[in-house]
Amino acid sequence: MNIEITESQFKKMFFSIMNILFPNIEYSEKQDGNKGYDITSDGEIVFRIYKRGNVNELFIPENTIKTIIDFIPQVSKKPRLLSKLISSFINEKTGLEIFSVEFWMLDSDGNLIDGNLMMRYNYKQ
């Protein structure tokens, strides 16, 4: 039996899983001198936003990507969808509009793809 899942259904499921994986999302201005925000869940930094002028760029640390792929291995095959969903999730939680998303892409086993594949997706021109 083949089951079709729409993008909106997948987004709803993804947001539910993200709320379980990263409860109590909070953000604060970075303390290391760089302009931007640290986004934490239960005190642990799970995302970083860097400000370049008026633009917010989201960086997703490797351990955060690994956690997400461990729960939803299918997203390792769709990095553009993954970045779009994470951007929407962060926007909903913080109200910060994301211009681009950067992350190291991992396969479903948690290994770096091609050794060092940095994915970067821009949303607004």
Kindly give the residue locations of the regions a language model identified.
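Short acidic, low-complexity intrinsically disordered linear motifs used
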Residues: 1-17
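Compositionally biased low-complexity segments enriched in polar/charged residues
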Residues: 22-125
